[in-house]
Swiss-Prot record:
Promotes cell proliferation. Plays a role in tooth germ growth. Plays a role in the control of enamel mineralization. Binds the AMBN promoter. InterPro entries: Znf_C2H2_sf (IPR036236), Znf_C2H2_type (IPR013087). A motif (9aaTAD) lies at residues 118-126. This is Transcription factor Sp6. It comes from Mus musculus. The lineage of its organism: Eukaryota, Metazoa, Chordata, Craniata, Vertebrata. Disruption phenotype: Develops fewer, smaller, incisors at 3 months of age in a transcription factor ASCL5/AmeloD knockout background. Epithelial cell invasion is inhibited and CDH1/E-cadherin ectopically expressed in dental epithelial cells at 3 months of age, in an ASCL5 knockout background. Belongs to the Sp1 C2H2-type zinc-finger protein family. It is found in: Nucleus. One of its GO terms (biological process) is regulation of odontogenesis. Signal peptide: none annotated. The gene is Sp6. One of its GO terms (cellular component) is nucleus.
Length: 376
């Protein structure tokens, strides 16, 4: 018996590859003539409502079969669900509710807004996507009386979210009688500013009047100028006398405090340069190639640079010589003055040796003067 069963299975296995595929019953395509209706005009209607119902849309599904819902005591059928819908009966009538503007509105809006606290925003197909309370001046959509009001305070609508705040004094922006716009501060603020400026000027005048005369400076000092600390200036400051060329009796007021020096200068800059000579500080350096010499004064550096450039800025007005330093030119001018004196002395000696020619009438005048002196 087992042998017969195995033989039958083997025969079926061997015959399976040689089996021919099932024959398909294909029919030729038929041309379809479109039906025209008077309502459609010149455009042909491809299908009629009766033909639409006869066309199969997919595998047939029996919607009459009931389904058991979790938590339900009895079976619920699709007919029972369709009877509750206000739309035309159909299997997809409950996919969209009549008050929903889109598929996801039920996520934001509860089904019964009167019995449940709503969220702070609401979506609806009106002109504005956000509804605000009536107490805050919002405009709600008339087509949705049950729309929830958002709990946003301080805003009057979505069109005014970016608007500037109202001016606290709108009457200041109104045009004046003369046609000018008062865009500046009000008159009260101007009056307060003027009063503050007057009080500041009065305080400064009182401070200047209460200041003692000895503490006032005859010459104003600039912000970058420092006070000289030489012995003469310190003594003058202690006595209350003005330290300067106007109030001092001596010409050289700023003296060197190094013991044994005693040099005095009329300018504080010269005294500072002299003190740098004592300390050995030479801040002015020549930047010429392979030079690098240092100097205590800036004018010394400038004169040194002229040796590199060869420029001579001080020409002599008498002769054609040019000098790099003004003191050299002054010394050279003395030679010209000495030559003039020598020439004048030589001309005077030549006149004495050759005889002096008397002007006409000179001898008679001398005789008259001599006779008048003897008679007296």
């Amino acid at each position: 018996m087992l042998t017969a069963v195995c033989g039958s299975l083997g025969s079926q296995h061997t015959d399976a590859p040689h089996a021919s595929p099932p024959r398909l019953d294909l029919q030729p395509l038929q041309t379809y003539q479109g039906h025209t209706s008077p309502e459609a005009g010149d455009y042909p209607s491809p299908l009629q409502p009766g033909e639409l119902q006869s066309l199969p849309l997919g595998p047939e599904v029996d919607f009459s079969q009931g389904y058991e819902l979790p938590g339900a005591s009895s079976r619920v059928t699709c007919e029972d669900l369709e009877s509750d819908s206000p739309l035309a009966p159909g299997p997809f009538s409950k996919l969209l509710q009549p008050d929903m503007s889109h598929h996801y509105e039920s996520w934001f809006r509860p089904t019964h807004p009167g019995t449940e606290d709503g969220s702070w925003w609401d979506l609806h197909p009106g002109t504005s996507w956000m509804d605000l309370p009536h107490t805050q001046g919002a405009l709600t959509s008339p087509g949705h009386p049950g729309a929830l009001q958002p709990a946003l305070g301080g805003y009057v609508g979505d069109h005014q979210l970016c608007a500037p705040p109202p001016h606290p004094h709108p009457h200041h922006l109104l045009p004046a009688a003369g046609g000018q716009h008062l865009l500046g501060p009000p008159d009260g603020a101007k009056a307060l500013e003027a009063a503050a400026q007057e009080s500041q000027g009065l305080d400064s005048s009182l401070d200047a009047a209460s200041r003692p005369k000895g503490s006032r400076r005859s010459v104003p000092r600039s912000s970058g100028q420092t006070v000289c600390r030489c012995p003469n200036c310190l003594e003058a400051e202690r006595l209350g006398a003005p330290c300067g060329p106007d109030g001092g009796k001596k010409k050289h007021l700023h003296n060197c405090h190094i013991p044994g020096c005693g040099k005095a200068y009329a300018k504080t800059s010269h005294l500072k340069a002299h003190l740098r000579w004592h300390s050995g500080d030479r801040p002015f350096v020549c930047n010429w190639l392979f030079c690098g010499k240092r100097f205590t004064r800036s004018d010394e550096l400038q004169r040194h640079l002229q040796t590199h450039t060869g420029t001579k800025k001080f020409p002599c007005a008498v002769c054609s010589r040019v000098f790099m330093r003004s003191d050299h030119l002054a010394k050279h001018m003395k030679t010209h003055e000495g030559a003039k004196e020598e020439a004048a002395a030589a001309a005077q000696g030549e006149g004495k040796a050759g005889g002096v020619v008397e002007p006409p009438g000179g001898k008679g005048k001398r005789e008259a003067e001599g006779s008048s002196a003897s008679s007296n």
